[in-house]
C-alpha cells in the first residue's frame, strides 16, 4: 500500500495552476495519486460483496434456518449500520474512512487556503496536521452521507426501478394512476447519469491537479484528499508539561491504577497495528479464495456438461419391437397398417405412424405404443365416456 504513497505527484512540477499560491507553489504536493484513491474505492465496493459471498456459501448453506436466512435477506441493512459506526469513528478520530486509512489516505478541509499553502511551504508541516485543516462537523456528516446513506438509498431505488421495469414488460395495461411510476422511470435514471457525469468531471479536475476532491459533494464542501499525517490536538500545551514531573509518586490505589492504565494504553495501538497488517492480507486471501471456488465450480459444471455429451443408451425394447425391427422396410412403413406412412405423426416413444392409424390404435389398446407396447403418458381414460382419449400422446409432422 505504501508503494503508491511514494510515487511522485504529477502536479508537483506544474506551475501557475488554479491552486497556486505564494511563489507559484500550490496544493499539488498534498494530493495523493489517483491509483491510491481508485484502489481504495474498489476495495470499499468489493468488501460487502465478499462478506455476503462468505455468508451465503458457508453460514446459510451449512446452517439453513430462519435466522440465517433473515441475516442474509437483510444483509445490506445491518452491514451498512455496522459500517456506519466504524466509518464515523474513523472520521471523528482520524479524518479518514476505514478503507482509506489502510491505504494511507486522509481527508482535509481546504476552506482555509492560506493555511494549506503554509503547510506546503513549511517543512515542519510534514510532521503534524494543524487543527484548521481538519474536517469540521458538517464535512464529516457529508462524508458519512456519501459513504453510508447515499449508497443505501441508491441500492433501494435501483431495486424499485428494476421491479417497475419488469412489471411494465409483463403487463401491457397502462392507466392514468401510474403516472408517478412513469415519472420515476424517466427522472431517476437521468439524475443518476447526471451525478455520475458530475463525479467524472471532478475526477478529471483531480487528474489536472486543480482540486483534491474526487466527487461532487467533496468539491462543493471543500473536502480534499491527502496522505496520512498525525493530527494536532487542541490542547497541544499539555504536551510540553508531559513528562516534566519526575518526582517520586505515592504508591496508593489511584497511582497504581493510573500506572496500570498507562501500561495498558499500548493495547489499542497494538490492535490497530495488527489490524493494519491483517486487513490487506484478509482482502487478498478473500479474493484468492473466491477465484479458487469459482474455478472449482467451473470445473464441476464442465464435467457435468461432458457427462451429458456422452452417448445415451437406447431404451430396452420388448420382444414384439425386436421382431418388428427385423422386418424389411419397417422404417418406411406404418407399424399399425404396415403400409407407407400417410399423414405422418410421431408418438411419445419416437416412432412414426399414420395419424388415423395411431389414433385408432391408441384408443382401442388403452394407450399403448404399437411398437414398444409402452403406456403413453398423453393417453388418459375418460370416466364419463368410459373411453380412452389421446390428449398429448402424438404430434403431427409437416413434411
UniProtKB/Swiss-Prot annotation:
Positions with biased composition (Low complexity): 9-24
Top-level lineage group: Eukaryota
Membrane topology classification: Multi-pass membrane protein
Pathway in which this enzyme or protein is active: Protein modification; protein ubiquitination
Keywords of the record: Membrane, Metal-binding, Peroxisome, Protein transport, Transmembrane, Transmembrane helix, Transport, Ubl conjugation pathway, Zinc, Zinc-finger
A single MF term (Gene Ontology): protein transmembrane transporter activity
SUPFAM superfamilies, per database record: RING/U-box
Topology Peroxisomal matrix: residue spans: 1-33, 93-136, 209-277
Family: Belongs to the pex2/pex10/pex12 family.
Protein's job: Component of a retrotranslocation channel required for peroxisome organization by mediating export of the PEX5 receptor from peroxisomes to the cytosol, thereby promoting PEX5 recycling. The retrotranslocation channel is composed of PEX2, PEX10 and PEX12; each subunit contributing transmembrane segments that coassemble into an open channel that specifically allows the passage of PEX5 through the peroxisomal membrane. PEX12 also regulates PEX5 recycling by activating the E3 ubiquitin-protein ligase activity of PEX10.
Listed name of the protein: Peroxisome assembly protein 12
Amino acid at each position: 500500500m505504501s508503494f503508491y504513497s511514494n510515487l511522485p505527484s504529477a502536479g508537483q512540477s506544474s506551475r501557475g495552476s488554479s491552486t497556486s499560491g505564494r511563489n507559484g507553489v500550490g496544493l499539488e504536493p498534498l494530493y495523493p495519486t489517483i491509483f491510491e484513491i481508485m484502489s481504495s474505492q474498489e476495495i470499499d465496493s468489493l468488501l460487502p460483496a465478499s462478506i455476503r459471498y462468505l455468508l451465503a456459501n458457508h453460514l446459510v448453506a451449512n446452517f439453513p434456518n430462519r435466522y440465517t436466512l433473515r441475516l442474509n435477506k437483510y444483509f445490506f441493512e445491518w452491514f451498512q449500520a455496522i459500517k456506519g459506526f466504524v466509518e464515523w469513528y474513523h472520521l471523528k478520530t482520524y479524518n479518514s474512512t476505514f478503507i482509506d486509512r489502510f491505504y494511507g489516505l486522509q481527508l482535509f478541509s481546504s476552506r482555509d487556503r492560506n493555511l494549506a499553502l503554509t503547510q506546503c511551504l513549511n517543512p515542519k508541516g510534514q510532521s503534524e496536521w494543524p487543527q484548521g485543516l481538519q474536517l469540521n462537523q458538517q464535512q464529516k456528516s457529508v462524508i458519512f452521507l456519501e459513504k453510508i446513506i447515499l449508497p443505501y438509498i441508491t441500492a433501494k431505488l435501483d431495486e424499485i426501478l428494476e421491479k417497475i421495469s419488469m412489471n411494465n414488460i409483463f403487463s401491457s395495461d397502462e392507466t392514468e394512476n401510474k403516472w408517478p411510476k412513469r415519472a420515476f422511470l424517466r427522472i431517476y435514471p437521468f439524475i443518476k447519469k447526471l451525478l455520475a457525469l458530475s463525479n467524472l468531471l471532478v475526477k478529471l479536475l483531480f487528474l489536472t491537479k486543480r482540486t483534491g476532491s474526487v466527487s461532487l459533494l467533496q468539491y462543493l464542501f471543500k473536502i480534499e484528499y491527502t496522505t496520512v499525517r498525525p493530527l494536532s490536538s487542541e490542547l497541544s500545551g499539555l504536551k510540553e508539561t508531559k513528562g516534566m514531573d519526575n518526582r517520586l509518586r505515592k504508591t496508593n490505589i489511584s497511582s497504581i491504577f493510573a500506572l496500570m492504565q498507562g501500561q495498558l494504553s499500548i493495547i489499542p495501538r497494538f490492535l490497530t497495528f495488527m489490524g493494519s497488517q491483517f486487513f490487506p492480507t484478509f482482502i487478498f486471501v478473500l479474493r484468492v479464495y473466491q477465484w479458487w471456488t469459482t474455478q472449482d465450480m467451473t470445473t464441476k459444471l464442465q464435467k457435468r456438461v461432458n457427462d451429458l455429451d456422452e452417448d445415451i443408451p437406447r431404451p430396452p425394447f420388448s420382444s414384439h419391437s425386436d421382431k418388428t425391427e427385423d422386418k424389411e422396410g419397417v422404417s418406411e412403413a406404418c407399424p399399425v397398417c404396415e403400409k407407407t406412412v400417410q399423414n405422418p405423426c410421431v408418438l411419445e416413444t419416437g416412432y412414426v405412424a399414420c395419424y388415423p392409424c395411431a389414433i385408432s390404435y391408441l384408443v382401442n389398446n388403452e394407450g399403448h405404443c404399437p411398437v414398444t407396447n409402452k403406456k403413453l403418458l398423453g393417453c388418459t381414460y375418460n370416466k364419463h365416456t368410459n373411453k380412452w382419449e389421446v390428449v398429448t400422446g402424438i404430434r403431427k409432422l409437416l413434411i
